[in-house]
A protein has these predicted regions:
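Non-transmembrane, membrane-proximal soluble domains of secreted or membrane proteins
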Residues: 2-22, 45-220, 379-425
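Alpha-helical transmembrane segments
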Residues: 22-50
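Generic hydrophobic, aliphatic-rich segments that mediate packing or membrane embedding
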Residues: 40, 66-73, 270, 319
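Intrinsically disordered, low-complexity regulatory segments
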Residues: 213-380
Length: 425
């Protein structure tokens, strides 16, 4: 069932118990769905009109249904008291001792996570909403003695492995929902409150990353296509016209003054501006939104050999216009590979690619040119801190990453951050 549900990787101490509960619930739902479906179709067949032309007003006379209901109540009581409530108590209610835990504050805002570490003294410094600025997102008072060694990071949570983490979660503006899928932890962030949540990581980020290593077959990249670019047309402008599907290919001028510029859409307002200035003819081309989803698979140069559009570049409007202005009407392109979240896990010296560098469409084309067919890749940041609040694209993009380190690595990182504080004074 876990494989069927495609649950995320697990790096927390109690994650497997949560996964077992999720799997159990789905098995129960599956069995109930089968059972109720069988009962439903049986009832349709058993009590069909042709077999029961006259209604029976007596109904069920046995106590079978009553006992079934009693059995269902007993089963659900056992499920709650023996499984759900103990797991909830162990995983959520029973907090570890503070002296044995890493303690941080995380304050959400539209649209970022601000992480506040108490520093060496273990005390959180004073914060004040009146001190909040772009450079001081939580309004920490650096004049306060407890705040002098406090470390603040943005969308980055560093924590040591094999040690409980207690997070005091809050929000500056609206309700957010902090989620750590790989750590099986999630809690809403409420404005004006600091709500505690906890988990215990048992794998480092590197160990989790090793579990994401996969081989990618470059022959499975989206197919390369020959793309015919839109033609440059000479359009006649008339009052009341709306040519919003067209984009200007040159400046529209009157008496040496520019009225509209190359690259502007010919919407109703711009058409009116042309009419008002007695401009009746312009050169333009149709806009094709599909082109912006494609990437060039080779370099395109002007007459003198200068590169206009490099290989691996999205065909946005500016580049399409540039190609057409240089008499290039056809290009080879493909759809994006959608490997933005991966890094290379090996060196590929023949394509000048080193281990740990980001997978880009340009580098994939370089690998193909070098004759490499299979590559080893892994997730760049396998452990995310995301906003699970279903309130639009801004919340969806409100993501950071978690770096789980050994205690020694964490101590070194913290000392580096503290040194940065001293240097900035």
């Amino acid at each position: 069932m876990r494989e069927f549900l495609n649950l995320p990787l697990d790096a927390s101490e109690n994650g497997y118990k949560i996964d077992e509960m999720i799997a159990l619930i789905h098995w129960i739902m599956f069995i109930l769905a089968i059972g109720w479906s069988v009962f439903f179709y049986y009832s349709i067949y058993k009590f069909r009109k042709s077999n029961n032309p006259v209604a029976n007003y007596t109904g069920v006379t046995t106590k079978t249904s009553t006992w079934l209901e009693v059995g269902l109540v007993v089963f659900e009581t056992i499920l709650l008291t023996a499984f759900a409530m103990p797991l909830w108590a162990e995983r959520v209610v029973e907090f570890p001792a503070k002296e044995e835990s890493t303690i941080v504050r995380i304050i959400g805002e539209q649209f970022a996570w601000n992480v506040h570490y108490p520093g060496v003294d273990g005390k959180f410094g004073r914060t004040d909403v009146l001190l909040i600025t772009a450079d001081n997102p939580i309004g920490i008072d650096r004049e306060n003695e407890d705040a002098k060694d406090d470390v603040i990071t943005n969308n980055q949570l560093n924590i040591p492995v094999n040690k409980p983490v207690i997070i005091y979660l809050g929000s500056k503006d609206v309700i957010h929902s902090l989620s750590f899928p790989v750590l099986r932890a999630k809690h809403d962030a409420m404005p004006g409150q600091l709500i505690p949540m906890w988990f215990k990581p048992v794998k480092t980020s590197l160990e989790v990353q090793n579990e994401t290593i996969q081989t990618y077959d470059l022959t499975k990249l989206p197919a390369t296509k020959n793309i015919i670019l839109p033609k440059i047309e000479e359009l006649t402008i008339s009052a009341g016209g709306n040519l919003k599907n067209y984009i200007l290919m040159e400046n529209a001028t009157k008496d040496g003054n520019d009225v509209l510029y190359s690259g502007m859409l010919l919407d109703a307002d711009n058409v009116k501006a042309l009419v008002d200035n007695s401009i009746s003819k312009v050169k333009a081309r149709k806009v094709n939104p599909v082109l912006q989803t494609l990437l060039t698979t080779e370099d395109y140069k002007d007459a003198t050999g200068n590169i206009l559009v490099p290989m691996g570049t999205p065909l946005i409007d500016d580049f399409v216009s540039m190609l057409l202005q240089n008499n290039i009407s056809q290009v080879t392109a493909r759809h994006k590979a959608k490997l933005n979240y991966f890094i290379y896990w090996e060196d590929y010296s023949s394509a000048s690619i080193s281990k740990g560098s980001a997978v880009t469409d340009l580098s994939l084309e370089q690998l193909k040119i070098a004759g490499i067919k299979n590559i080893s890749i892994a997730l760049a940041t396998p452990i995310e801190m995301a906003c699970a609040q279903l309130c639009g694209l801004g919340h969806y993009r409100m993501r950071g990453y978690v770096n789980i380190q050994t205690q020694e690595e964490y101590d070194i990182w913290m000392k580096e951050k503290e040194a940065e504080l001293v240097a900035s004074e």
